[in-house]
Amino acid sequence: MMLAALETFYRKGIARTSLNEIAQAAGVTRGALYWHFKNKEDLFDALFQRICDDIENCIAQDAEDAEGGSWAVFRHTLLHFFERLQSNDIYYKFHNILFLKCEHTEQNAAVIAIARKHQAIWREKITAVLTEAVENQDLADDLDKETAVIFIKSTLDGLIWRWFSSCERFDLGKTAPRIIGIMMDNLENHPDLRRK
């Protein structure tokens, strides 16, 4: 059912997808779908949680495989995230839905709230990475973490959005490492990312 929901959301967007269409795509009755999920938002939340759990498991594995301190691990996990985004169909479709097909409308308010809840969780994780990098002296102790988090999210989200929406498709595998390198260099060195 989750894969059917992913496919249907990917094709039609969230606002234009009905539970009936998802049930048909899954080859089950609408009643069977309601047995597991009370509404479309509940299904989207379960899908979001499942994919986020998978991403977290991949990040944990990446961290285990990486050499160096937490800052090097952060770089390694970001590189692997973008590799998976380009090569894994489920990741691709899920992020495509989030960035291009999660309409910000009144009828989609519950879905947007779910997405924001998960964004807040990732914001906390990025803040924890920055805190550890400061403690390990990989980053300056006067790092403005709030601005740094905004900078990281803007860079990563901007790269993802640009890749999905670009008419001239670029090679994410070649571009992402360079953008990540520039971002991390700025986090390490740029004076505007220091507390005033």
Placement of each model-derived feature along the sequence:
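C-terminal peripheral helix-coil segments that are non-catalytic and often amphipathic
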Residues: 76-84, 120-136, 150-196
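Amphipathic alpha-helical packing segments from all-alpha helical-bundle domains
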Residues: 53-56, 60-61, 68, 72, ...
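Short coil/turn segments at alpha/beta junctions that flank glycine-rich nucleotide-binding fingerprints
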Residues: 11-15, 66, 88, 136-137
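Helix-turn-helix
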Residues: 4-42, 46, 50
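Hydrophobic/aromatic residues within well-ordered alpha-helical segments
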Residues: 40, 47, 51, 55, ...
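Amphipathic alpha-helical segments used for helix-helix packing
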Residues: 73, 86-113
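Hydrophobic alpha-helical connector segments
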Residues: 46, 60-93, 145-152, 192-193
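Secondary-structure edge/capping motif, primarily at the C-terminal ends of alpha-helices
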Residues: 62, 66, 99-102, 106, ...
